[in-house]
Amino acid sequence: MIARELIGLIDEAFPTTKARAISGHSMGGHGALTLALKHPGRFSSVSAFAPIVAPGQVPWGRKALRHYLGEDDAAWRAHDTVALIEDGARLDELLVDIGDADPFLEKELRPELLEAACEAAGIDLTLRRQPGYDHSYYFISTFMADHLRWHAARL
């Protein structure tokens, strides 16, 4: 719904092209990844900052999915980046930055699960673990220009 309706509204209000990029931070990064995977070809470039990539496999994600979608673990897969990739969704390439001092890194973000899924699926993942950075907006602002350059090169 977001990918279709929001893009339609933007296209009506502004001069746009079909080349689009999507990015986000934390849960917004999760949203960017799942939207891109669910709508192949809609986005020319995809990146994320510290996304939760496998909510069905981590405590906070399981709690949130249970709250929003109920107890059916199978329904959760449509909202889980790693599960979508395991189920056949594909991107050509992907940029993800994550801070190695992020307090959510080991229990919630689990980038190694994304690495394994992308490797198995042949997705070109650039995963950069940024030394000393946490989950803050300072982290995002530090690497935002890199992401903009990444997207610009693909649009």
Question: How would you name each of these model-derived features?
Answer:
Residues 1-155:
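Non-catalytic cap/lid and distal C-terminal segments of serine-dependent acyl enzymes
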